[in-house]
Amino acid sequence: MAKVLFVKANNRPADQSATVKLYESFLKTYKETHPEDAVTELNLFDAELPYYDLNMLNGLFKVGKGIEATAEEQKAADLANTYLDQFLGADKVVFAFPLWNFTIPAQLLTYLFYLNQAGKTFKYTEQGPVGLVGDKKIALLQARGGVYSEGPMAALEMSLNYVKNTLAFWGINNPEVVVVEGHNQFPDRAEAIIQDGVKRAADLAAKF
């Protein structure tokens, strides 16, 4: 039995969000084809994660070094480590997130900040940082209304690239990826574009 964590970074309803359609398609098919696995869903908007701030920064440093932290620092560090432990304990993780204003939602950025901890997801060496979770299986589901995979908008794509670069820093270099793009740019083909992505998400889920 595998432990699977589904991380959802979009609070729009499915009828308004291609990203959520991908998420629901993947989740439904995964549960149908892997009934023995333990699935946990984490909705980052429902979680209302506090921003990564001075208390969390100092708290994580002090806790990691065995230094006494203030009550506020300890509380912040414990919160971040709760999410980190959940991530580390999962055999597979599925992220679903949109491209908003060229990047990822603030909720996902905050979550990734929680996970980005030296000694846990990466370590420093004389040769440079080395990822520590390269054996984790990852799927990324994303929808973006314009075309960012090529052409003049490609340089502005700081959403999927950001997440992939963060994962690579942790040693995860080959995540499975399903992207839907162009459904707002080409409204006459929007439904076909989205449904193609929904099918690809389901196909990936069946073999993930």
Per-range role (PLM):
Residues 1-97, 102-106, 110-113, 117, ...:
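N-terminal beta1-alpha1-beta2 submodule of the flavodoxin-like/Rossmannoid cofactor-binding fold
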Residues 9, 143, 180:
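Cofactor-binding loop segments of dinucleotide-utilizing enzymes, especially the Rossmann-like FAD-
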Residues 118-124:
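Substrate-gripping "pore-loop 1 plus following alpha2 helix"
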